[in-house]
Structure formats: C-alpha cells, structure tokens
C-alpha cells in the first residue's frame, strides 16, 4: 500500500517470479511509474492498482503487505493504511511499514496488529506486525 514509484514491489516481483505482487497507490503518477517499471523489467507477476480507499483485490488473502505512508502527514492517513493492511492480510500475515516517525506506531499499531516490532536503519524505521 502506498507503492510510490514501485521500487519495493518491483524488487519483490523480480526476486521471485512465483510471487503474485500487487502494488496499490492513490496517486496516478505513482501508479504509472510502477507500471512502467514493471514493463521495463518484464514482470508479469506484478499487478498495479489505482485506488483512493486502500482496497485490494481478494481481501484477507495476502501473506505480506508493505506500506510506505507519507511521513509528515496527519496520522489519519496512517490509520487508513493500517485499516487497509488488516483487510488485505490473511490471519498470520505480516505487515512491514516504513516510517520516519516510529513513536506513533509504537503506541498505536497494536490496535491493528500483534507482535509489533520497530527496527531502525539510519533515519528510517521499519514497523513489523502480524494480523491475528
């Protein structure tokens, strides 16, 4: 969710052609950039979706959701990403989210996910959690 230019989705799809990867974003330019990257890399296992609701095809079936919500926006957007993540993931599925503001996720991500952990790499933080 929030695929942006598609770097993470393209890397996952290229790494394992057996994966089915969905890239979702609300910005048409981001979706187009991801589609171009998928085509240039000849990735038939990467589907790209433009949506403003964080809805995904086949909710409750995803093993992994990666999220890259805006770093300096209202946390209402983060809540929408987490709502969409829970709808997308199957039970036991994982979420990995990138942020520069980990404290909010440390305090609140447990409302959506269990076993929440935060890892730091430079100025970025990865938040990992699992759907019950």
Predicted segments, located by residue:
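Conserved SAM/SAH cofactor-binding pocket of Class I
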Residues: 1-67
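Class I S-adenosylmethionine-dependent transferase superfamily signal
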Residues: 12, 84-85, 109
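Conserved SAM-binding loop
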Residues: 23, 97, 118
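Short beta->alpha hinge that forms the Motif I/post-I loop of the SAM-binding pocket
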Residues: 25-29, 77, 100-101
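A short glycine-rich, Lys/Arg-flanked "PGG" loop and its adjoining helix->strand segment in the class I
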Residues: 79-91
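Conserved beta-strand signature within the Rossmann-like core of class I S-adenosyl-L-methionine
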Residues: 92-99
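Conserved class I S-adenosyl-L-methionine
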Residues: 100-112
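Core SAM-dependent methyltransferase catalytic element
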Residues: 119-132
């Amino acid at each position: 969710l929030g695929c942006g230019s598609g770097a993470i989705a393209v890397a996952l799809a290229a790494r394992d052609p057996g994966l089915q990867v969905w890239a979702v974003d609300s910005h048409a330019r981001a979706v187009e950039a991801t589609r171009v990257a998928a085509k240039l890399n000849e990735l038939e296992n990467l589907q790209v979706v433009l949506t403003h609701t964080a809805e995904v095809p086949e909710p409750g079936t995803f093993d992994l959701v990666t999220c890259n919500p805006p770093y300096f926006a209202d946390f209402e957007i983060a809540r929408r990403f987490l709502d969409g993540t829970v709808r997308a993931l199957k039970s036991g599925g994982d979420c990995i989210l990138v942020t520069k503001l980990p404290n909010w996720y440390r305090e609140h991500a447990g409302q959506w996910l269990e076993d929440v952990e935060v890892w730091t790499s430079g100025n970025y933080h990865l938040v990992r959690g699992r759907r019950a």
